[in-house]
């Protein structure tokens, strides 16, 4: 598959397909023409010796310092080197790859003044899967993601570290191996590479993809739990949800009915009890609300994926040129969205932990043994799996605190309000990893509970899931190192996201 970039129409589904199918990038001709026109404006500014921020002046507090024309290119290289102050563990290779795609798409809007050489260098790195190693920490989220994007830019000019064919190498060595020249930054180009929100947005895109999939995966896991507890299906009737109007809730209820169709383990109202606890009865309402969050986040991300968030921005209208210093680099809209994402995913984990507690608690699990132990007393069974889930959801409650309510001044108070959007993105992904493990714990426990109940009573769809995951996690016949089972399921759930055959 080829992904065609035009600066205007990139979607998250495009990105997901690109990652699944190991695609290549192509650029449409109209976008290249826009790049040429905006670059011509920069060249005119240089020729006319105009005073324009970041082209003929310094940066930040030094915006009033005029640069000697012979040093315009040096200014851009100095910018990249000095701003590459990222720290900590690197972003995943998927996030770094998406970061390059998003920055390229922004340049194609034709408001940044980049050269075709810069555009082609980004395209080359993407298509050859030369992945810059980009530290996660160091961004305030305004002026955009300066530190992470500077590490991206270092790789393009042959000075950074990259991951290539599974090995960490110097960018310069990889470029020599591929007979490719490092990029020679021209006036404005360093700024055009780093003034933007691509780090937080790229992590946000990956987080959205994985969150949405977790939402779908949580439904069949919940369906296993529901059957193991002889849950009541009446609460999932369409008319119950239609009168509330939330489409996401209606959709979850429909999918739950589909997962449970044909089960002989489910019950009706008053057969065993009149109504279930909320963690079973309210799955459509709780999970549906998370999908509402996901839909909002998707909308915000796709706006930003196709936005010009450089500074200054170049405009041409009726043969008149405008170069305007604005603030589109400010990450506040994405920071808010990614803080919301943390809430949506945290609740999937919270309700999962409460469901699995019902499976192991002898006061709540009906006729199942305490902690599903094969020999209660001598063997502890799933006792500490619930502890682990409780620990993860409690950690998520701390991580879910909104990063976007924080701000700190920088650049001698010139940049006196920042978004902390990349912090929101990073914490959000930690929540996703924790939530995936909580759902893996519920899966391991629900598989065992279903076995004890009798898998022949499962619905056909959940029986297939049971068989699929029993190939990863064998029956619990004695105590063992359950952390291995949990991690194996969590990894399987994660890997399935980027396969063309999804779990849902």
Curated annotation (Swiss-Prot):
Keywords: Cytoplasm, Histidine metabolism, Lyase. It comes from the Bacteria. The keyword Lyase applies. PROSITE patterns: PAL_HISTIDASE. Gene3D superfamilies: Fumarase/aspartase (Central domain) (1.20.200.10), Fumarase/aspartase (N-terminal domain) (1.10.275.10). Its EC number is 4.3.1.3. The keyword Cytoplasm applies. Contains an active site 4-methylidene-imidazol-5-one (MIO), which is formed autocatalytically by cyclization and dehydration of residues Ala-Ser-Gly. One of its GO terms (molecular function) is histidine ammonia-lyase activity. CDD domains: PAL-HAL. Coiled coil: none annotated. This is Histidine ammonia-lyase. It comes from Staphylococcus aureus (strain MSSA476). The gene is hutH.
